[in-house]
Amino acid sequence: TGQICLCGSRILVQSSVLPEFQEKLLAATAAMRVGDPAEETTHIGSLVSEPHYLKVKQAIEAAPGTVLCGGGRPNNLPDRCRDGWFLEPTILTDLPESCALEEEEVFGPVASLRAFSDEPEALRLANATPYGLAASVWTKDLDRAHRLVQRVEAGVIWINAWMVRDLRTPFG
């Protein structure tokens, strides 16, 4: 549900692979099942409360970009979940760099998708937020990954992985 502080909410993709990546991302997002967390087939449960649901929904509605998918309540919720605070996973694009969704933590199933042309632009975009708890760098070029890890301003940075960690390690 994007309600942990290590969730990535800004997806930066090299422009040369953006069309293929976007197609695969949207297909994977469409396959996610939102619903009853007690059911094994559910990928995303509800948001924590009505005020939080309204905050996330308002952030989506106020975003000056394009909603590629999601943004609403799922239509196929089981009866026992109909009054819950469920939200479809949402991906937005065409956002200005200075909008709230690019600069603030939303803590919901919301992500922005943005292209970058080269490594310096990727680095600039990655560091263009006061929130830098975690980041993930995905690339076939390990030299590039190590260069970026040295310059991205984040406390935890994964290379070609996410949420792989030792829970005994100090954090925060």
Indicate where each model-derived feature is located.
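ALDH superfamily catalytic-core signature
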Residues: 1-96, 125, 159
